[in-house]
Amino acid sequence: MHITYDLPVAIDDIIEAKQRLAGRIYKTGMPRSNYFSERCKGEIFLKFENMQRTGSFKIRGAFNKLSSLTDAEKRKGVVACSAGNHAQGVSLSCAMLGIDGKVVMPKGAPKSKVAATCDYSAEVVLHGDNFNDTIAKVSEIVEMEGRIFIPPYDDPKVIAGQGTIGLEIMEDLYDVDNVIVPIGGGGLIAGIAVAIKSINPTIRVIGVQSENVHGMAASFHSGEITTHRTTGTLADGCDVSRPGNLTYEIVRELVDDIVLVSEDEIRNSMIALIQRNKVVTEGAGALACAALLSGKLDQYIQNRKTVSIISGGNIDLSRVSQITGFVDA
């Protein structure tokens, strides 16, 4: 028996998304980490979405959204904007579904992510220097070509797709006490929160953002949507200064807490994952583990079972070298 909330996404939407995704994506592993368990004085399990197709969780929401389009909408083609992971998720989903896709990426997007997006099938348009520039170009393409826009996070189908991670967690570790989730625009934590809380509302869902960019945390703690960004962050995949309207509504209702981590804590988390768990992750993917190592979650995690979401692993090797100190930054 599931609990139903009056929110834009329900548990039934996530179950439908799981059915659409069956055979199309991986059910990612979630092993117990001895290192993190010993450090945190609890049982810590790592959910490896960095091992997902395209290297991040984003394909879940992208595929669910695209497969939900009508035949007429699919024939129009789609357009998305992203600096990396959403772009790759949309591009591969288009290839699997036979949809013509176009992705607008900022000129400064990592070359490896641009190349991967092209390889998966979509036409890449490099435009502008930031999200505002790319979204303006997307609006132009929608108007000129009639394509369907695929949002990166603030969409019910996208949120439901990301929520399938929550279902997998409950299948593999039904007695989990806490789920720790990175936050950018909020699609991932919103979907996971709906899935988890609909099955067992006593499980804590806790978000993590960078001190440098934390629009969702600022909104969550102030009680209204607001913007926060001081400078860039190693967690560039979560460099979103303002949360979505839908994601904020869900987070405000269902998420238990949001904590902030420093750039040094993110860096140390990435290094720990490489050295101790042999896992390469991007900065955004290391946010949840950064919070675990920081001590800021000790009140929740000690002597309890906790899942930490490793949301993505798309990072250039040169960046890994800089972070681990093999070459100068």
UniProtKB/Swiss-Prot annotation:
Cofactor: pyridoxal 5'-phosphate
Induction: In the absence of glucose and oxygen.
Superkingdom to which the source organism belongs: Bacteria
EC number: 4.3.1.19, 4.3.1.17
Keywords noted in UniProt: Allosteric enzyme, Lyase, Nucleotide-binding, Pyridoxal phosphate
GO biological process, one term: threonine catabolic process
Positions annotated to bind AMP: R53, T54, Q88, D119, Y120, N314
Signal peptide segment: none
Positions carrying N6-(pyridoxal phosphate)lysine: K58
Pathway membership, UniProt: Amino-acid degradation; L-threonine degradation via propanoate pathway; propanoate from L-threonine: step 1/4
NCBIfam families: ilvA_1Cterm, PRK08638.1
Function: Catalyzes the anaerobic formation of alpha-ketobutyrate and ammonia from threonine in a two-step reaction. The first step involved a dehydration of threonine and a production of enamine intermediates (aminocrotonate), which tautomerizes to its imine form (iminobutyrate). Both intermediates are unstable and short-lived. The second step is the nonenzymatic hydrolysis of the enamine/imine intermediates to form 2-ketobutyrate and free ammonia. In the low water environment of the cell, the second step is accelerated by RidA.
Name used for this protein in its record: L-threonine dehydratase catabolic TdcB
Species name: Escherichia coli (strain K12)
Organism classification: Bacteria, Pseudomonadati, Pseudomonadota, Gammaproteobacteria, Enterobacterales
Name of the gene: tdcB
